[in-house]
A protein has these predicted regions:
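Ribonuclease/tRNase effector modules and their secretory precursors
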Residues: 1-80
Length: 80
């Protein structure tokens, strides 16, 4: 599966100092179906859980956005 980062996702990762390989590791270890998903994971080294929004179409995984989830839920692995 090919992983593509949107321009917005690249900017959020740079702003919040989230390494690209951290996001890729989380996504490679998940079984995701077609459609849009919200993923919340605890990541070592980050104060807050990391939220990643992705879309999967035709075996291409596009990261729409990613950021530390500072408010609300801290449940790991939430999928919508």
């Amino acid at each position: 599966m090919q992983i593509i980062f949107s321009r917005h996702a690249k900017r959020r990762a740079r702003l919040y100092k989230i390494a690209r390989f951290t996001i890729e590791d989380i996504l490679k270890n998940m079984e995701l179906s077609q459609g849009e998903h919200e993923i919340v994971k605890e990541v070592k080294g980050l104060k807050y859980p990391l939220k990643i929004v992705v879309r999967i179409e035709n075996d291409i995984l596009t990261v729409i956005t990613n950021y530390p989830l500072k408010k609300g839920r801290k449940n790991e692995g939430i999928l919508r």
